[in-house]
């Protein structure tokens, strides 16, 4: 069974990025961090709210992960570990909780959380991601 995956953006800050929550089958799974909304500019903006198909891929940098597909004007939008907005390059970072690192807004325990995400998604090659904004 393909799970329902929702990303709810909770806060958007040009300095600290877009903080959100990822739900799997309507259950809170983890915190997210994306670049701030900068009109969908490649590498520096979060992608627009909406529905997107995500497909499992083998990334040269992040190995086994999921790519958000068919984003207008964008490509290579991945789920991956990272802590601060500078780590995103337009992608979706996952972490256990929100916090601060060196004075920057961050998500914490990202590596372990990404590993848990991929374990939770074992056997699933595609899913639909619904992104909404609640700010």
Outline where the language-model segments fall:
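Cell wall/extracellular polymer interaction/catalysis modules
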Residues: 1-128, 132-135
